[in-house]
């Protein structure tokens, strides 16, 4: 259903944001 899709997208976004934050902290 829609809930599963939303959870999947939320996980993807969280991973991407985590990567961006890690990059900024390394600089």
Curated annotation (Swiss-Prot):
Subcellular location: Secreted
Biological process according to GO: defense response to bacterium
Keyword set includes DNA-binding: no
Glutamic acid 1-amide modified-residue sites: 27
Tissue: Expressed by the venom gland.
Main location: secreted
A Gene Ontology cellular-component term: extracellular region
Keywords for the protein's UniProt record, in alphabetical order: Amidation, Secreted, Toxin
UniProt GO molecular function: toxin activity
Family label: Belongs to the cationic peptide 04 (cupiennin) family. 03 subfamily.
Protein name: Cupiennin-3d
Protein source organism: Cupiennius salei (American wandering spider)
Lineage per the UniProt record: Eukaryota, Metazoa, Ecdysozoa, Arthropoda, Chelicerata
